[in-house]
């Protein structure tokens, strides 16, 4: 059996709360994890290190640049919005086009998450620090 990758790409859907065994309310994050597809396999013989590149999320094929689009068409992979490379011990166990699902993790397992925040651009102090401002009437 192939050794599973301990990582998948996902999207935060929101927050909710659950009760633990002691009836305490615990905040939890809901994440749509996968399905990811293997888009590239790096081997020590060819690339000098062992890794697997994963793709996640759908994107309109017209928005993909020409070199990446040609590579994905050549390997019959639908275009993906996000790509990341995950190092692994033996990348030769994976094939291009193979799906990696969220069953990599067990229920209740703690995971490390790396995120990318939404950019808000250059903002003034009211938006940046959440100031409410004063009443908008005459004299103030």
UniProtKB/Swiss-Prot annotation:
The keyword Signal does not apply. One of its GO terms (biological process) is translation. InterPro entries: Ribosomal_L3_dom_3_arc_sf, Ribosomal_uL3, Ribosomal_uL3_bac/org-type, Ribosomal_uL3_CS, Transl_B-barrel_sf. GO terms for molecular function: rRNA binding; structural constituent of ribosome. Keywords: Ribonucleoprotein, Ribosomal protein, RNA-binding, rRNA-binding. GO terms for cellular component: cytosolic large ribosomal subunit. Part of the 50S ribosomal subunit. Forms a cluster with proteins L14 and L19. Belongs to the universal ribosomal protein uL3 family. One of the primary rRNA binding proteins, it binds directly near the 3'-end of the 23S rRNA, where it nucleates assembly of the 50S subunit. This is Large ribosomal subunit protein uL3. It comes from Planobispora rosea. The lineage of its organism: Bacteria, Bacillati, Actinomycetota, Actinomycetes, Streptosporangiales.
